[in-house]
């Protein structure tokens, strides 16, 4: 038996009601399209006990980078290195960010525009700094990261 159904069975047999939901962070006040699975149990309750509250508290629209951070990046478009070159890499601040990963690479000199990129690689399009990426992950501006560049990038990528 797969792990999740087995875990749910054990929890339910212990008397818990369970709410399971996949939430997109951009509907929860985070300027990033990042889906995450949540499973919450409450003793002596019915299944789905939090469904109504979760749905009621979701935003009616996705949070954009601009809504969250304004024009603090000083550019309308920015580069985020794609997992593969089959994916776009240039994003607009007027949309939720793609998932922030634990790597932050510069724009390759040989980068060719993907058909879904929001702009050409040109003057003003740049990679985000580690600090800017941390803001998208909702770290407060005064948060100070300690450690190597690799460790800091990994911490930023693993947040949210």
Regions inferred by a protein language model and the residue ranges of each:
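Class I S-adenosyl-L-methionine
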Residues: 1-99, 103-105
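C-terminal target-recognition/interaction regions appended to catalytic cores
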Residues: 70-160
């Amino acid at each position: 038996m797969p792990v999740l159904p087995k875990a749910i069975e054990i929890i339910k047999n212990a008397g818990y009601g369970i709410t399971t939901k996949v939430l997109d962070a951009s509907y929860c006040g985070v300027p990033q399209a990042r889906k995450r699975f949540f499973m919450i149990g409450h003793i002596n309750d019915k299944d789905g006990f939090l469904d109504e509250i979760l749905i009621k508290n979701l935003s009616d629209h996705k949070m954009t980078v601009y809504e969250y951070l304004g024009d603090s990046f000083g550019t309308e478009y920015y580069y985020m290195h794609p997992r593969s070159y089959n994916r776009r890499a240039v994003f607009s601040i007027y949309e939720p960010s793609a998932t922030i990963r634990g790597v932050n690479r510069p724009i390759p000199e040989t980068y060719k525009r993907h058909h879904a990129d929001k702009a050409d690689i040109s003057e003003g399009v740049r990679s985000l700094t580690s600090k800017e990426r941390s803001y998208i992950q909702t770290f407060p501006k005064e948060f100070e990261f300690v450690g190597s560049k690799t460790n800091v990038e990994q911490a930023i990528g693993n947040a949210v």
